[in-house]
Amino acid sequence: MKRKIVILLGPTGVGKTELSIKIAKLLNAEIISSDSMQIYKYMDIGTAKPTLEQRKEVIHHMIDIVNPWDYFSTGAYIEIVKEVIEKIFEREKIPLVVGGTGLYLRAMTEGIFEGPDADWNLRMELMNKERDNPGFLYNLLKEIDPIKADKIYPSDLRRILRALEVFFKEKKQISELQEKLTKPLSYNFIKIGVTRERKELYRIIEERVDKMICSGLIEEVRNVLTLIKRNATSLSPLPALQAIGYKEIAGCLADLYSIDEAVRLIKKRTKMYAKRQFTWFRKEKDIMWFDISGRHDFEIIAEQIYSALSEILHK
């Protein structure tokens, strides 16, 4: 019989962090973050990491494991997570995966596409063409791989670059290659989803962004930019700097627009990201959904989820 792993998923701002800690205590679990930006060191406020106090309450994994000037693939994430999961089981605890990033979750449960290594010279060549002619790369991808282009936002240069890079190196469309996935991790995944009414979620997001600014996000971004400038070995776009909050504040610090405009953009893009997460998670199979609209009684919500989980975990 496959060992069981619990996944707690939901859109950004829904309350997963606080809820996960309470569920973990009830389950005697350790938490594994599946957030692609919480992996980066020094990026605490903008990624809404669990506080140090929260991490003392329950052991957390996959947080602060990579420098923001480094690159970290989904494949690398999975390799580390496999070891983390086994060690949690050795301690006779339950792994509680909290996310987050749909790609990480899907890689765990369904497998991952293993593409070629990054070609920085090719990426720089493509980026130079994009600078000379904005929109060039997305239009090129639409010609080469229209199926993949339909799934990527025109502004998502990192994913557009990767799709083009794979095509030029493999001579095949990434949409075709992604059908040939590696095997998923060999566990029984129990998926719990938490959601809120969209209007309420958007209000929470706006309040959270304001709180991040008041908590020192601008200074945090300035510090991260200084560290990257001092340590980065490549001029290629860094995934860490594409994180919502960091990208917009960096633009403000570069005098591209005002702080008010940066805050407006962060709120707008965070809402768009939450909407994409809704769409992504709704496509996932076998999720037990809990609508927590209007609720912040996380102790009671955790007990309700634990009650539902207990029957499944002890089968």
Swiss-Prot record:
Catalytically driven reaction(s): adenosine(37) in tRNA + dimethylallyl diphosphate = N(6)-dimethylallyladenosine(37) in tRNA + diphosphate
Cofactor dependence: Mg(2+)
Chain positions recorded as substrate binding sites: 12-17
GO biological process: tRNA modification
InterPro entries: Dimethylallyltransferase, IPT, P-loop_NTPase
Protein name: tRNA dimethylallyltransferase
Domain of life from the UniProt record: Bacteria
SUPFAM superfamilies: P-loop containing nucleoside triphosphate hydrolases
Oligomeric and partner information: Monomer.
Function: Catalyzes the transfer of a dimethylallyl group onto the adenine at position 37 in tRNAs that read codons beginning with uridine, leading to the formation of N6-(dimethylallyl)adenosine (i(6)A).
Gene from which this protein is expressed: miaA
Alphabetical keyword list: ATP-binding, Magnesium, Nucleotide-binding, Transferase, tRNA processing
Site (Interaction with substrate tRNA) location in chain: 101, 123
Annotated family: Belongs to the IPP transferase family.
Enzyme Commission (EC) number: 2.5.1.75
Region (Interaction with substrate tRNA), start-end ranges: 35-38
Binding site for ATP: 10-17
Gene Ontology terms for molecular function: ATP binding; tRNA dimethylallyltransferase activity
Pfam family, one: IPPT
